[in-house]
């Protein structure tokens, strides 16, 4: 009958629309993941150019994480947000994550930074992935010299077994300015 044909057509149309929306969302997720992977490779290449010893540190660590962030500062307040991924060197598993931060203090401008975390131990790596992490509200952390040719030369020790390199538009930073920044899993991408 006509009502059954209309019903079947509506069900088919709804299924097609649902599938189209799902496929579009899934393709956007895949595209975002690929953009993060590309940004990760770019950040690592830049780091290795500025600090060749970082390659050894990352290759021999339990894992690493790379985050690209954009910060905006308007007068007395500011913030930054970004995305990245953490890679377990043993399993090669990629976990996609987000970062968000707030900053107080006088300033004006937009800054792009890349943070590269190096996790010496599996427990430090797993804690970062599963529990997230937060830089406190205190001031900047200075990079350790690490000795000539030191494995973590130019990196900042931010927790036991966790070192961070920061790259700005002007090169490898001598301090980490990620205060008030929180890192957590990106449920939409994992």
Question: Where are these predicted regions, by residue range?
Answer:
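Small-residue-enriched, tightly packed secondary-structure blocks
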Residues: 24-190
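Short, linear, compositionally biased motifs with a strong N-terminal bias
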Residues: 12-15
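N-terminal signal peptide c-region/cleavage motif recognized by signal peptidases
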Residues: 18-20
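Bacterial N-terminal signal peptides that target proteins for export
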Residues: 1-9
């Amino acid at each position: 009958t006509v009502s059954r044909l209309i019903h079947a057509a509506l069900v088919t149309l709804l299924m097609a629309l649902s599938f189209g929306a799902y496929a579009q969302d899934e393709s956007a997720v895949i595209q975002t993941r690929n953009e993060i992977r590309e940004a990760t490779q770019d950040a690592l290449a830049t780091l290795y150019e500025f600090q060749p010893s970082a390659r050894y540190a990352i290759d021999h660590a339990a894992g690493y994480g790379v985050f690209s962030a954009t910060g905006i500062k308007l007068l007395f307040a500011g913030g930054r947000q970004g995305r990245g991924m953490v890679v377990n060197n043993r399993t090669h598993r990629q976990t996609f994550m987000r970062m968000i931060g707030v900053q107080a203090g006088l300033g004006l401008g937009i800054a792009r930074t890349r943070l590269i975390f190096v996790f010496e131990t599996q427990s430090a790596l797993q804690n970062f992935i599963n529990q997230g992490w937060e830089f406190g509200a205190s001031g900047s952390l200075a990079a350790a010299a690490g000795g000539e040719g030191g494995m973590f030369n130019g990196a900042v020790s931010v927790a036991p077994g966790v070192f961070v390199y920061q790259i700005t538009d002007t090169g490898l930073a001598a301090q980490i300015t990620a205060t008030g920044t929180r890192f957590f899993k990106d449920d939409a991408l994992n």
